[in-house]
């Protein structure tokens, strides 16, 4: 929450009797609100440790006399819901990279961000997880360890600017080996869609020329720098193969807007049930919009695929994965 929206906070405070700040861990926002002269409460009510679950917040409010001792009963239906692992969003630009990495089966270092979801099924294509920028340092170590196969790391554009430049420079200076994949989706998506120097917007809502990530990497001494359209499966695969074959430090920048940044979905894709062979390859894309239908393949008995039109944003990665061209835009259905 920076810069703090002081005008908005004052307008809110003027319309209520009491201001209560609910935030996990340290009273970061609470202290700033109090510094504005607003008598806010927070950590005298809520715990400074651990995660604040809804029931914990309600109990703390009851103890502080903010809520009545009795609360309306509610039915917890979570136990009856089917469980599933977290997934990359429909239309996520990282999907093609992790799909290719899962096929190439190379060691992959990660740090923290949306791309951590590449660790989970169906990709299983990221093997370490750490702090922001840790992936580049771990990749450097992998290269020094004498791994027989090439190794790569994944890092987001925002994380690269925040904590990835220094370890990349160190890797080049010390003659490391490996491929740094900078997944440029024009935002820091998992932690709140903060802007970074790679886009035109500034914190003061002005516009500037964005920092060129490729140019910055070359300035750090990286000689092999490639870019690829994140939604072009074949282009990403070709660039990955070229970078991992390079004897030294290479950088691959995959470019594609986060679906919450572009906000311009294309028409949903459609599965031709007559062409679908129920091979399941599109399901391996890990897209939540690609699901199993009730239609069954007559020979194998396996369920065919279909696409949820409400959630599909038409990125087209599933169409490129399908081996029989059974997925197309609605104009070709």
Predicted stretch roles:
Residues 28, 269, 277, 281-306, ...:
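Iron-sulfur cluster-binding cysteine motifs and their immediate structural context
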Residues 21-23, 40-43, 68-72, 108-111, ...:
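General beta-strand structural signal in soluble alpha/beta enzymes
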Residues 72-136, 145-148:
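Active-site diphosphate/adenylate-binding microenvironment
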Residues 2-71, 329-333:
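Terminal amphipathic helices with adjacent charged low-complexity linkers/tails
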Residues 119-253, 263-267:
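Thiamine diphosphate
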Residues 3, 27-29, 47-50, 115-117, ...:
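Short gly/pro/ser/thr-enriched loop/turn and capping motifs at secondary-structure boundaries
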Residues 53, 78, 86-94, 158-162, ...:
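Active-site glycine- and acidic-residue-rich loops that bind
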């Amino acid at each position: 929450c920076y810069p703090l929206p002081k005008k908005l906070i004052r307008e809110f405070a003027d319309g209520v009797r009491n201001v209560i700040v609910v935030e996990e861990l340290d009273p970061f926002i609470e202290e700033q609100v109090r510094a504005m002269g607003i008598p806010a409460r927070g950590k005298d009510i809520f715990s400074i440790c651990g995660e604040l679950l809804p029931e914990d917040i309600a109990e703390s409010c009851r103890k502080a006399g903010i809520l009545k001792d009795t609360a309306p009963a509610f039915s917890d239906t979570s136990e009856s819901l089917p469980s599933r692992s977290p997934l990359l969003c429909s239309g996520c630009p990282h999907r093609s990279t992790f799909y290719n990495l899962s096929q190439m089966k190379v060691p992959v270092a990660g740090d923290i961000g949306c791309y951590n979801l590449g660790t989970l099924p169906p990709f299983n294509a990221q093997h370490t997880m750490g702090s922001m920028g840790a992936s580049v340092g771990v990749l450097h170590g992998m290269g020094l360890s004498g791994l027989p196969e090439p190794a790569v790391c994944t890092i987001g554009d925002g994380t690269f600017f925040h904590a990835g430049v220094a370890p990349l420079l160190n890797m080049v200076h010390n003659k490391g080996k490996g491929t740094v994949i900078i997944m440029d989706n024009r935002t820091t998506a998992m932690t709140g869609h903060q802007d970074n120097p790679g886009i035109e917007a500034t914190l003061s809502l002005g516009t500037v020329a964005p920092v060129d990530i490729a140019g910055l990497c070359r300035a750090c001494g990286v000689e092999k720098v490639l870019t690829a359209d994140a939604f072009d499966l074949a282009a990403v695969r070709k660039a990955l193969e070229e970078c991992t074959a390079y004897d030294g430090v290479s950088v691959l920048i995959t470019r594609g807007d986060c679906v919450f940044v572009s906000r311009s979905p294309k028409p949903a894709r459609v599965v031709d049930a007559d062409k679908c062979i129920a091979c399941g390859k599109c399901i391996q894309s890990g897209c939540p919009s690609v699901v199993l239908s009730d239609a069954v393949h007559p020979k194998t008995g396996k369920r065919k695929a279909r696409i949820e039109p409400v959630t599909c944003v038409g990125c087209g990665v599933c169409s490129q994965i399908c081996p029989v061209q059974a997925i197309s835009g609605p104009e070709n259905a």
